[in-house]
């Protein structure tokens, strides 16, 4: 195995850990690293739908993983299999992204407005028209894949379009933390502070990830104050409102609520249909009405999954040269779309938990008491109690003959862990959504 392949295998391992097995197998397993030249990584994708989906859903995951493995920043450039001559066009598009580190696809024009996101959209547009004066800070919160990143990026793109001289910075809180730690390690704090305290617009995605990181919170607090005092626009996104973010300081939580707080809810069916038609139009695909309704009626809570279902369907029909139809949609999306009539059983919950943590069902049914197995067993018991009407004795019996007291203890332990560790809450939420088909 040559050096490039070794690097790529390590990167794939990181991506697998971040996105989960099903997403990895579908979207990342088929792509490969062709070459690395002059800080540019050339990635081969089967067709443009893969490129579009990765850029829309995980725009920085490959470059971030490169940095984690090699310590070097790279610019990712996509090459479509068999179409090397299109590389220049793709590279040209990628150059636009460099400005403010913004994805040019995320604009107000491409954002579908509905009752579930109307307020957040209106607030974002107002901020974009009058940065630093309308609502400062603007705090947008909502579940995973509902359009928070799209909106805060649209703010940046709009401002740069109208006022290209402005210094717009988009960054995730994880990236902010990583650069902060690196600056301390390499004694480059003055450069770090100059980079983030001199911007005109500060767009921060997924702020909840600084929870529990005291030094990062301290640095972010002073960065926030410096920008706010100069009337520079601050926009923050999170998966929950400020008051529900645990393990952050009260003074930081207070800063988050100083301006306007806007939420995004899961889209209703009309908005989901509009999103599908908009995405299909952007991809140059004719989407039959029955297929659109089929997808929209099944994928209910997540715009990212909604668009992902369409992109998977488009990728399949593009590769196989067959037209989009209801039969094709049902076949291609059979694993992604839930069966609404499927009852929630303890076996279904055990399977979902084990898939999420990488164990076998027989492990959590066994007498084994390793920490990994014990934690998974407690999670499964907790979710079973939450989603079913089974008695405590019935739940215990399904986990290797445990008694009702063990189930009660397990549920209490999970509740405590949820309060201390937000990653546990996110894991439980994702498992519940998978089991319930949301």
From Swiss-Prot:
<keyword id="KW-0446">Lipid-binding</keyword>
<dbReference type="InterPro" id="IPR024633">
    <property type="entry name" value="DnaA_N_dom"/>
</dbReference>
<dbReference type="InterPro" id="IPR001957">
    <property type="entry name" value="Chromosome_initiator_DnaA"/>
</dbReference>
<dbReference type="InterPro" id="IPR013317">
    <property type="entry name" value="DnaA_dom"/>
</dbReference>
<feature type="region of interest" description="Domain III, AAA+ region">
    <location>
        <begin position="101"/>
        <end position="317"/>
    </location>
</feature>
<protein>
    <recommendedName>
        <fullName>Chromosomal replication initiator protein DnaA</fullName>
    </recommendedName>
</protein>
<dbReference type="GO" id="GO:0006270">
    <property type="term" value="P:DNA replication initiation"/>
</dbReference>
<dbReference type="InterPro" id="IPR038454">
    <property type="entry name" value="DnaA_N_sf"/>
</dbReference>
<comment type="subunit">
    <text>Oligomerizes as a right-handed, spiral filament on DNA at oriC.</text>
</comment>
<dbReference type="InterPro" id="IPR003593">
    <property type="entry name" value="AAA+_ATPase"/>
</dbReference>
<dbReference type="InterPro" id="IPR013159">
    <property type="entry name" value="DnaA_C"/>
</dbReference>
<dbReference type="InterPro" id="IPR010921">
    <property type="entry name" value="Trp_repressor/repl_initiator"/>
</dbReference>
<keyword id="KW-0067">ATP-binding</keyword>
<feature type="binding site">
    <location>
        <position position="148"/>
    </location>
    <ligand>
        <name>ATP</name>
    </ligand>
</feature>
<dbReference type="Pfam" id="PF00308">
    <property type="entry name" value="Bac_DnaA"/>
</dbReference>
<dbReference type="GO" id="GO:0006260">
    <property type="term" value="P:DNA replication"/>
</dbReference>
<keyword id="KW-0547">Nucleotide-binding</keyword>
<dbReference type="GO" id="GO:0008289">
    <property type="term" value="F:lipid binding"/>
</dbReference>
<comment type="function">
    <text>Plays an essential role in the initiation and regulation of chromosomal replication. ATP-DnaA binds to the origin of replication (oriC) to initiate formation of the DNA replication initiation complex once per cell cycle. Binds the DnaA box (a 9 base pair repeat at the origin) and separates the double-stranded (ds)DNA. Forms a right-handed helical filament on oriC DNA; dsDNA binds to the exterior of the filament while single-stranded (ss)DNA is stabiized in the filament's interior.</text>
</comment>
<dbReference type="Pfam" id="PF08299">
    <property type="entry name" value="Bac_DnaA_C"/>
</dbReference>
<dbReference type="GO" id="GO:0003688">
    <property type="term" value="F:DNA replication origin binding"/>
</dbReference>
<feature type="region of interest" description="Domain I, interacts with DnaA modulators">
    <location>
        <begin position="1"/>
        <end position="74"/>
    </location>
</feature>
<feature type="binding site">
    <location>
        <position position="149"/>
    </location>
    <ligand>
        <name>ATP</name>
    </ligand>
</feature>
<dbReference type="InterPro" id="IPR020591">
    <property type="entry name" value="Chromosome_initiator_DnaA-like"/>
</dbReference>
<feature type="region of interest" description="Domain II">
    <location>
        <begin position="74"/>
        <end position="100"/>
    </location>
</feature>
<keyword id="KW-0963">Cytoplasm</keyword>
<dbReference type="GO" id="GO:0016887">
    <property type="term" value="F:ATP hydrolysis activity"/>
</dbReference>
<feature type="region of interest" description="Domain IV, binds dsDNA">
    <location>
        <begin position="318"/>
        <end position="438"/>
    </location>
</feature>
<dbReference type="InterPro" id="IPR027417">
    <property type="entry name" value="P-loop_NTPase"/>
</dbReference>
<dbReference type="GO" id="GO:0005524">
    <property type="term" value="F:ATP binding"/>
</dbReference>
<dbReference type="GO" id="GO:0005886">
    <property type="term" value="C:plasma membrane"/>
</dbReference>
<comment type="similarity">
    <text>Belongs to the DnaA family.</text>
</comment>
<dbReference type="InterPro" id="IPR018312">
    <property type="entry name" value="Chromosome_initiator_DnaA_CS"/>
</dbReference>
<feature type="binding site">
    <location>
        <position position="147"/>
    </location>
    <ligand>
        <name>ATP</name>
    </ligand>
</feature>
<keyword id="KW-0238">DNA-binding</keyword>
<dbReference type="GO" id="GO:0005737">
    <property type="term" value="C:cytoplasm"/>
</dbReference>
<dbReference type="Pfam" id="PF11638">
    <property type="entry name" value="DnaA_N"/>
</dbReference>
<keyword id="KW-0235">DNA replication</keyword>
<dbReference type="GO" id="GO:0006275">
    <property type="term" value="P:regulation of DNA replication"/>
</dbReference>
<feature type="binding site">
    <location>
        <position position="145"/>
    </location>
    <ligand>
        <name>ATP</name>
    </ligand>
</feature>
């Amino acid at each position: 195995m040559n050096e490039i392949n070794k690097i790529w295998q390590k990167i794939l391992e990181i991506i697998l850990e971040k996105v989960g097995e099903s997403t990895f197998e579908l979207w990342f397993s088929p792509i490969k690293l062709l070459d690395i030249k002059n800080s540019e990584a050339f990635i081969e994708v089967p067709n443009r739908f893969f490129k579009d989906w990765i850029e829309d859903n995980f725009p920085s995951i490959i470059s971030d993983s490169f940095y984690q493995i090699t310590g070097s920043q790279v610019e990712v450039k996509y090459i479509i299999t068999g179409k090397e001559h299109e590389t220049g066009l793709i590279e040209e598009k990628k150059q636009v992204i460099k400005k403010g580190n913004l994805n040019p696809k995320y604009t107000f024009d491409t954002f579908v407005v509905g009752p579930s996101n109307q307020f957040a959209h209106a607030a974002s547009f107002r901020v974009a028209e009058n940065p630093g004066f309308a609502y400062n800070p603007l705090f947008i919160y909502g579940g995973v894949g509902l359009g928070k990143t799209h909106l805060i990026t649209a703010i940046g793109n709009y401002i740069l379009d109208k006022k290209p001289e402005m210094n717009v910075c988009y960054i995730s809180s994880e990236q902010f933390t990583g650069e902060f730690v690196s600056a301390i390690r390499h004694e480059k704090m003055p450069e770090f502070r100059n980079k983030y305290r001199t911007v005109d617009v500060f767009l921060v995605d997924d702020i909840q990830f600084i929870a529990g990181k005291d030094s990062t919170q301290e640095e972010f607090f002073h960065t926030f104050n410096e920008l706010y005092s100069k009337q520079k626009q601050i926009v923050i996104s999170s998966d929950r409102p400020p008051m529900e973010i645990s393990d952050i300081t009260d003074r930081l939580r207070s800063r988050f609520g100083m301006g306007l707080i806007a939420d995004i809810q899961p889209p209703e069916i009309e908005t989901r249909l509009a999103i599908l038609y908009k995405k299909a139009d952007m991809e140059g695909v004719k989407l039959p009405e029955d297929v659109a309704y089929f997808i929209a009626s099944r994928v209910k809570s997540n715009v990212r999954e909604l668009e992902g279902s369409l992109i998977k369907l488009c990728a399949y029909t593009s590769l196989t040269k067959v037209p989009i139809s209801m039969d094709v949609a049902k076949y291609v999306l059979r694993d992604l779309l839930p069966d609404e009539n499927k009852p929630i059983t303890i076996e279904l919950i055990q399977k979902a938990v084990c898939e999420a943590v990488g164990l076998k069902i027989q492990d959590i049914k066994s007498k084994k008491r390793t920490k990994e197995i014990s934690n998974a067993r407690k999670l499964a018991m907790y979710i079973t109690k939450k989603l079913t009407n089974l008695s405590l004795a019935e739940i215990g019996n399904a986990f290797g003959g445990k008694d009702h007291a063990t189930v009660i203890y397990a549920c209490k332990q999970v509740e405590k862990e949820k309060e201390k560790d937000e990653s546990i809450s996110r894991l439980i939420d994702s498992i519940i959504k998978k089991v319930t088909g949301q």
